[in-house]
């Protein structure tokens, strides 16, 4: 791993703050927690993890063990494993680790928890959010390269009509109002998203679904 000295580059990244493509870690003490960040970036648009920084400047990587823990997160606690690109920058007498994560072509990338249960995450603004059944359905269809064919039965029209009337609904509300189970409604909402009829957005710790503008 090559060591670089580029103070301006790191200072610029720190000045950007955390966002959809960047996360700061003051220190690393748990590889499983880092796996969540790796999963979120890989399942969204890719991104960068800066280790040894905080919002107001450089803290420095405490030991080489933190570097090994990032590598362990990618190989031991991500399923499937993901490849990372890492660089160390020597800034202000301290080391900063930059970890580049590419968007995966094998979504979802799962992070294993303490019980080795797999969970997929997505990156929204500056947060790692647990993926919902809609994400999983979309990724499943993308992997299988299925064509989206919408058949407008009474059931499909009912969903669109309800969304038009209500404005925005949660997955649970969609299930209740249509009297479909979560598995059925999740598949239909995923198809509608892939077809460009509706969109999902995240607000106050909840995913909502609404018609796209013009629909």
What are these regions (language model features)?
Residues 1-215:
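Conserved N-terminal catalytic/coupling substructures associated with nucleotide/phosphate chemistry
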């Amino acid at each position: 791993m090559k060591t670089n000295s580029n103070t301006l580059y790191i200072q610029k990244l720190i000045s950007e703050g955390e966002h959809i493509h960047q996360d700061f870690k003051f220190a690393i003490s748990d590889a499983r927690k880092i796996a969540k960040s790796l999963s979120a970036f890989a399942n969204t648009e890719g991104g960068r993890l800066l280790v040894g920084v905080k919002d107001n400047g450089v803290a420095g990587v405490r030991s080489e063990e933190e570097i090994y823990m990032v590598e362990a997160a990618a190989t031991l606690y991500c399923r499937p494993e993901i490849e990372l690109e890492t660089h160390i920058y020597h800034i202000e007498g301290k080391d900063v680790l930059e970890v580049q994560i590419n968007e995966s072509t094998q979504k979802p990338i799962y992070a294993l928890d303490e019980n080795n249960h797999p969970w997929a995450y997505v990156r929204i603004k500056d947060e790692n959010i647990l993926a919902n059944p809609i994400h999983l359905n979309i990724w499943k269809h993308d992997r299988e390269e299925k064509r989206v064919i919408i058949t407008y039965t009474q059931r499909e029209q009912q969903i669109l009509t309800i969304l038009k009337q209500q404005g925005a609904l949660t997955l649970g509300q969609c299930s209740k109002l249509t009297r479909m189970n979560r598995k059925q409604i999740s598949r239909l909402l995923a198809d509608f998203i892939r077809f460009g009829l509706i969109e999902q957005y995240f607000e106050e710790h909840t995913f909502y679904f609404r018609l796209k503008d013009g629909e």
